[in-house]
From Swiss-Prot:
Pathway: Pyrimidine metabolism; UMP biosynthesis via de novo pathway; orotate from (S)-dihydroorotate (quinone route): step 1/1. Signal peptide: none annotated. NCBIfam families: PRK05286.1-1, PRK05286.1-2, PRK05286.1-4, PRK05286.2-5, pyrD_sub2. InterPro entries: Aldolase_TIM (IPR013785), DHO_dehydrogenase (IPR050074), Dihydroorotate_DH_1_2 (IPR012135), Dihydroorotate_DH_2 (IPR005719), Dihydroorotate_DH_cat (IPR005720), Dihydroorotate_DH_CS (IPR001295). This is Dihydroorotate dehydrogenase (quinone). Keywords: Cell membrane, Flavoprotein, FMN, Membrane, Oxidoreductase, Pyrimidine biosynthesis. It catalyses: (S)-dihydroorotate + a quinone = orotate + a quinol. It is found in: Cell membrane. Binds 1 FMN per subunit. GO terms for cellular component: cytoplasm; plasma membrane. It comes from Photobacterium profundum (strain SS9). The keyword Membrane applies. Its EC number is 1.3.5.2.
């Protein structure tokens, strides 16, 4: 009830202004009596994935808390893990506004943020301040002005800085809003990137005396042979996990709806079936070699269960959280 009232107010605002205001308030309210508006008890449902123990299998997807400002607030909502970022080596402002749009009839969102963030050093400081006792994933990307052929350097810089503070590291090569980024998902470019990341992981594990898993985040807009190729590269390079999927460029299910023609990645309910199908095909090709984190259009316990039945061991929410609030976390944990 409280969230429905808050949502009715926030949805009167520009989508990005509402997002920024929510982040500011979460940051301000945590640890005060006002956090009772979103704090809830979610029963433990432990699961071990990538060698990590998670309190429950429901996580916050990257993109909502880009700079790690509200980790403790999301922890209070009962998330079993929180993925912050995407973060880049240097701060960047992202694409021009407006760049976030609600597709209300479809419970979808279209964004073309472009990795706006305050830089990896700022995020690390926020992670260090957090009192959250769950798993913190850190999602890393490349700066827009870094040439794609030098993109690996940005990922390695971020890995070096976040490694000690991350529960796992997510490698984002699938955002549609950074020019050329998705080209890193294919063929030799992917193999080359993954081999460099694996070598850096081994180096940092020896240096810090702990092993931090690597997970690759992929797009939904893939042909079947591309899914097969990605699975082969993941196994070959001994990557620890895969996150499926990011946002889609496909507009088939939202044609004619408000904002449907805006440039950017579409998330929410219209992505639900496609992301589940990618997970199913990945699971077939991986055959248990590494775990899958399922994300894309999860807005209920049933849609979370569909991802898990398709092969996901963990799930993440973003757009579903915007439309349904913290209650969705508890619903999924208790009923999926």
């Amino acid at each position: 009830m409280i969230y429905r009232l808050a949502r009715s107010v926030f949805f009167q605002l520009d989508a990005e202004k509402a997002h920024d205001l929510a982040i500011q308030n979460f940051s301000r309210f945590t640890g005060t009596p006002l956090d009772l508006f979103y704090r809830q008890h979610v029963p433990d449902r432990p699961v071990e994935v990538m060698g990590i123990k998670f309190k429950n299998p429901v996580g916050l997807a990257a993109g909502l808390d880009k700079n790690g400002e509200c980790i403790d607030a999301f922890g209070a909502m009962g998330f079993g893990f929180v993925e912050v970022g995407t973060v880049t080596p240097r701060p960047q402002s992202g694409n021009e506004k407006p760049r976030l749009f609600r597709v209300l009839p479809a419970e979808g969102l279209i964004n073309r943020f472009g990795f706006n963030n305050l830089g990896v050093d700022n995020l690390v400081e926020n992670v260090k301040k957090s009192k959250y006792d769950g798993v913190i994933g850190i999602n890393i990307g490349k700066n827009k002005d870094t040439p794609i052929e030098k993109g690996a350097e940005d990922y390695l810089i971020c890995m070096d800085k976040v490694y000690e503070h991350a529960g796992y590291i997510a490698v984002n090569i699938s955002s549609p809003n950074t020019p050329g980024l998705r080209s890193l998902q294919y063929g030799e470019a992917l193999d080359d990137l993954l081999s460099q990341l694996k070598a850096k992981q081994e180096e940092l594990a020896a240096k810090h005396g702990k092993y931090v898993p690597l997970a690759l985040k992929i797009a939904p807009d893939l042909e079947d042979h591309e899914i097969v190729q990605i699975a082969e590269s993941l196994i070959k390079n001994k990557i620890d996990g895969v996150i499926g999927t990011n946002t889609t460029l496909d507009r088939t299910l939202v044609k004619g709806m408000p904002h449907c023609d805006e440039m950017g990645g579409l998330s929410g309910r219209p992505l639900q079936n496609r992301s589940t199908e990618v997970i199913r095909r990945l699971a077939e090709e991986l055959n248990g070699a590494l775990p899958i984190i399922g994300v894309g259009g999860i807005d209920s316990a049933i849609s979370a269960r569909e991802k898990m039945n398709a092969g996901a061991q963990l799930v993440q929410i973003y757009s579903g959280f915007i439309y349904h609030g913290p209650k969705l976390v508890k619903d999924i944990v208790m009923n999926s």
